[in-house]
A protein has these predicted regions:
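Catalytic cores of alpha/beta
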Residues: 121-129, 172-186
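Flexible glycine-rich beta->alpha loop in the catalytic core of nucleotide-sugar glycosyltransferases
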Residues: 139-140, 186, 193
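Active-site entrance/lid segments in N-terminal catalytic domains of soluble metabolic enzymes
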Residues: 1-160, 164
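Catalytic nucleophile loop
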Residues: 32, 166, 180, 191
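Active-site-proximal beta-strands of protease catalytic cores
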Residues: 134, 184, 188-189
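A generic structured-segment signal
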Residues: 163-166, 176
Length: 203
């Protein structure tokens, strides 16, 4: 299935695995990427050298694109930002903060930057800052969320932006993917029970 997202990231399926803290490590990220989606390592509050190790371990398991989720409120965020640039990951997703101070560094290394946003205002700011796409995350999602539901947030962000929009929040199967397409998204980010049950997680 080809969409604007698959073409942007060089993947086969328009599905990004969410960067679940302490669950999304190298084994899960590699498995998702090998299956055709975009696997994500969740950096969470981990030290930068742990993230570096996870990136290198993922590269041993896949030659497909994968990414790192950088939680910007982490005290290690500046060091992690440098590590992902040095290690040459394909994609960075960001949450819990403003990635603008790292955008130039990542873009200079050819890294696609996809911030997670919970409002139209933040989505527009990220587009102006140079984001390649955004994840519009409804309040059904976990992590650092806003007040809008996925159903209301995604079409508003789609209408406001000229870059790809990925839907997140309450999406767990093909019906959710189809609904996201109807809302105007070009793909989804999932943190579903399907992933949580996988033997590649740390659970």
């Amino acid at each position: 299935m080809q969409t604007e997202l698959t073409r942007l990231l060089g993947i086969q399926a328009p599905i990004i695995q969410g960067g679940m803290a302490w669950v999304a490590e190298h084994t899960l990220a590699a498995a998702v990427s090998n299956a055709g989606g975009l696997g994500i390592i969740g950096a969470a509050n981990a030290p930068a050298e742990w993230v570096r190790e996870q990136i290198r371990l993922t590269k041993q398991l896949t030659d497909k694109p994968f990414g790192v989720n950088v939680m910007l409120m982490s005290p290690y965020a500046p060091e992690i930002a440098q590590v992902v640039a040095e290690e040459g990951v394909s994609v960075v997703t960001t949450g819990a903060g403003n990635p603008e101070s790292y955008m130039a560094l990542w873009k200079s290394k050819g890294i696609k930057v996809i911030p997670v946003v919970a409002s139209v205002a933040l989505a527009k700011r990220m587009e102006r800052a140079g984001a390649d796409a955004v994840v519009a995350e409804g309040c059904e999602s976990g992590g650092h969320i806003g007040e809008s539901t996925t159903m209301t947030l995604v079409p508003q962000v789609v209408d406001a932006l000229n870059i790809p929009v990925i839907a997140a929040g309450g999406i767990a199967d093909g019906r959710g993917l189809a609904a996201a397409f109807m809302l105007g998204a070009c793909g989804v980010q999932t943190v579903s029970y399907t992933h949580l049950r996988a033997h590649e997680t740390t659970l």
